[in-house]
Swiss-Prot record:
Start-end of Basic residues biased regions: 1-26
Single GO BP term: translation
Alphabetical list of SUPFAM superfamilies matching this protein: L35p-like
Disordered, as annotated region: 1-46
Protein name: Large ribosomal subunit protein bL35
Species of origin: Mycoplasmoides gallisepticum (strain R(low / passage 15 / clone 2)) (Mycoplasma gallisepticum)
Alphabetical list of PANTHER family matching this protein: 54S RIBOSOMAL PROTEIN BL35M, LARGE RIBOSOMAL SUBUNIT PROTEIN BL35M
Family membership: Belongs to the bacterial ribosomal protein bL35 family.
Molecular function in Gene Ontology: structural constituent of ribosome
């Protein structure tokens, strides 16, 4: 059976840490920003981690 190809769209959006977790950017950052408080925008700058329920699927998409 051939190797699975990496989905380039997913590879651009997710990065793997050395410990094996998957990092992602926060949603709600680029649109309607003036309506958000400075605190909200500051917290959205920080990367989040992929939730355990999505982990297996995302890992398959970015498999190398």
């Amino acid at each position: 059976m051939p190797k699975m190809k990496t989905k380039s769209a997913a590879a651009k959006r997710f990065k793997t840490t050395k410990s094996g977790k998957i990092k992602r950017k926060q949603a709600y950052t680029s649109h309607l920003a003036p309506n958000k408080t400075t605190k909200q925008k500051r917290h959205l700058r920080k990367d989040g981690l992929v939730h355990k329920t999505d982990f297996k699927r995302i890992k398959q998409l970015i498999a190398k």
